[in-house]
Regions:
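Structured soluble/peripheral alpha/beta segments that form catalytic or ligand/cofactor-binding pockets
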Residues: 1-338
Length: 338
């Protein structure tokens, strides 16, 4: 199983600072009018890093802190960075929080998050700069908690209004600039063991249904050692976050990828909300990132009530592949600390 928590207090570090533990804070945002998307992750311990995996069970999160930032436009990646960082801090005080990982910062104050973006490092060809503010639109402050497991998923701000500015530079010259306005998402994950300890693989995604509602889903397919797990929520700017009851997730149109993983490109989500039947179809529109154990997608949603397409971000993660020495070798690029 997986430990699931819903609520704004999910930002606060919750794990015991012991070897082999990790925590990360994830943000994504989409500007529909400019076909821009960005994903931002702050890591206190990088459980996908081959260096981290080699150091288990004694991996120290302080030695493997860092960030991952990727910028996309029109379904294609413009730039992306994954760096371990030397200078890091995590400061909490009541409902405020500040994290710095190298040149990347995020500050929480009340229901808003301000993220400062600076990926520049010596000899870098490209760099992303800017500042984005995520305003959580859920004023209901609903809470929910269920399940047990090594991994904890904390759903914090699944429906945000996002505004700010971004720029992409090449060799210190600004190549492109944008004023960003769109919708966004934020969650946090933490754990006490390797990601493959509980499940082999999973599907996760968040997608707008309309201007007021977002669907969030997590699905662990059945494996030889683990039962299937399907969980979903609807985030409503008026009524808050509600769990999808009797949630059923069906994987369709499974295809073999270039990295020899079988991944569904259509996902049907069924269940009930307040006694009303729910049926939402998610399709993978563009593969934004792909590798030997991970795919990130730009996705579209469709319902009987809202047949037009709305966008979101999704991932497929094959944790079992992280056990492979071949896969670890493939992703073992030189570790730059910035």
């Amino acid at each position: 199983m997986m430990h699931v928590k819903v609520g704004m207090d999910g930002d606060l570090p919750m794990r015991v600072q012991e070897p082999g533990t990790y925590e990360w804070w994830y943000f994504d945002a989409i500007d529909e009018s400019q076909e821009l998307a960005i994903t931002i992750i702050f890591f206190d311990g990088m459980p996908m890093s081959p260096y981290w995996l080699e150091a288990l069970p004694n991996a120290d999160s302080r030695e493997y802190s860092g960030y991952a930032v990727s910028l996309y436009r029109r379904g294609k990646k413009l730039a992306g960075f994954v760096h371990h960082t030397e200078h890091n801090e995590i400061i909490t005080h009541q409902d405020e929080m500040h994290i710095r990982m190298g040149g990347m910062t995020f500050r929480k104050s009340g229901n808003s998050y301000t993220i400062g973006i600076d990926t520049d490092y010596p000899d870098s060809v490209n760099s992303i700069h800017g500042e984005l503010t995520f305003h959580n639109t859920d004023e209901q402050k609903h809470t929910y908690e269920d399940g047990k497991g090594n991994h904890c998923w904390r759903l914090i701000a699944p429906q945000c209004k996002v505004e700010g500015n971004l720029s992409l530079s090449q060799y210190d010259d600004i190549h492109s600039e944008w004023t960003f306005e769109g919708h966004g998402y934020h969650d946090c994950n933490s754990g006490t063991d390797a990601l493959y300890a509980d499940y082999d693989d999973w599907y996760w995604g968040r997608c707008q249904i309309d201007n007021d509602q977002t669907i969030i889903y997590y699905h662990y397919p059945m494996s030889h050692e683990n039962e299937e797990l399907s969980i979903g929520f609807i985030a409503d700017s008026v009524h808050g976050i509600k769990k999808i009851e009797q949630c059923r997730i069906q994987l369709e149109n499974v295809k073999l990828t270039s990295s020899l993983m079988r991944i569904a490109s259509l996902i049907n989500i069924q269940g009930t909300i307040d006694g009303e039947e729910l049926n939402i179809r998610i399709s993978h529109a563009h593969a934004l990132e792909f590798g030997p154990f991970y795919y990130r997608y730009l996705i579209e949603s469709e319902t009987n009530q809202y047949p037009h397409n709305n966008h979101g971000i999704a991932e497929y993660f094959n944790a079992k592949r992280l056990k492979s020495r071949l896969v670890r070798t493939m992703i073992k690029t030189p570790m730059h600390r910035v």
